[in-house]
Structures are given as C-alpha cells and as structure tokens.
Amino acid sequence: QVVSNDRNARRFLDELGISGRYPAVRGDFIGVTTSNAAGSKIEIKDLGAVRGLMDELIYAAVFSDNDKTRKDLFILTKEIAKAAGAIPSSIQGLYEELGRDYHGFTVPAINIRGLTYDIARTIFRKAMEVDAGAFIFEVARSEIGYTKQRPLEYTTVVLAAAVREGYRGPVFVQGDHFQLVRKNFLSDPNAETGYIKGLIQEAIDAEFYNIDIDSSTLVDLEKPAIKEQQRPNFEKTA
C-alpha cells in the first residue's frame, strides 16, 4: 500500500482501490499528508520504486470505468510525478530569450494522438540520449475530441512518462490550436467563445502552461484591407 502517516490520506488511497487492486503499488516510498490528492504534500522516499509505479498507475487511471476514480488517480499520479522532478512549465521565458539574442536552435512540438504514455516515454528516452534541448508536447482542440484525451489525462500521462524514463526538469505541455470553429462562431459567437474559454480554463487547471489561441478561422478575406481582414482574428484572440 501507499504509505501515509495520515489516516484520512490512507483511507482516500484505499477508496481508490490502490492498495488492494494494484500490486505494483507497494512499499514505504511515498508519504501523502492530506486526504485531498490535488492538495497533497507528497514526499518521495524511493525514486526507483516510484518510477516502477508509473506503469501501473497510468494503466489503472486510463482504463478505469469510474469517472471519479479516473480523475482522482490522474491527480494523484500528476502530483507524484511533480514530486519526482517532472515539473509542468511555461516556455515563455525561453521564447523571450530566443527573440533577443539566444539563437541557433528550434523547439520541436509533438502532438501525440494515441499510445501517449508509450510514445512520450520514447521521446523522453531519446531526448536524454542525444542531450536534446527544449521540446513541447501538444494536443489540439480537435485532437482532444477525437482521441478522448482531456487535458488532465494528457498532462498526467506525459509527466508519468517523464518519471518512468528518469527525466527530471521542466516539461512543456501546450494546448495547440485551441481554435474557434468558424461555422459555430457565425451561428452563435458567445457560445463558441465560451467553449474556448472553458477549454482554456480546463487546460490551465491541468497545468498546461502554454496555450495557442487560434482564431485565424475568423479572417474575413472579403474585406479590401488586410487589417480589416485580420480584425476578427486579432480582436477575438485579444
């Protein structure tokens, strides 16, 4: 069982079924001090054991048929991963430096649409082998829909993959093309704008610290002047 000195925390983890159902989750290597996974203070006592735990936790979370259990396991796993050194981060500071005088490389962005845990593990493993610099994991609005990967799942799976491969440091996760659908916007601007705002909030709550707002679909090429063509784009983005 996951070890905790807090009885409420132990009860919370037992309610998830971790200690009884998932034999990989054993040993005195994690301490959880509160019953709320999102606010728990997690102490890693055996990093090697935690790395081995990731496969089991991700499988349990992704394939659980209970929505609450899935969410709780994703939150718990994400917090464990952060305590193990995989830190969700914003790439804004690096981009600011690139815009000034730090040149000579690009930042690859990778959209994973399936087998996300396995593919992310491969990416981290190869990045460490070649001593790669920054790279981003992305998922677009459309991909969230047809792959059924909500932001919390995507972030958690990527962070768990980082821990599993022994990666420590910033992990960049981006909402790619959080795009307004033109026909939806023309039909009901407030509803479509509200949907994108809600998706952005969900992504930030899941610790996406990079958001690509895409309202280029609203460009009106029937206008004679370029600025007026682009006005719906830049005004809605703002």
Regions found by a protein language model. Give the residues of each.
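Alpha/beta catalytic barrel-like cores
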Residues: Q1-Q174, R182-E192, F208
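Helix-rich catalytic cores of soluble enzyme domains
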Residues: Q179-A238
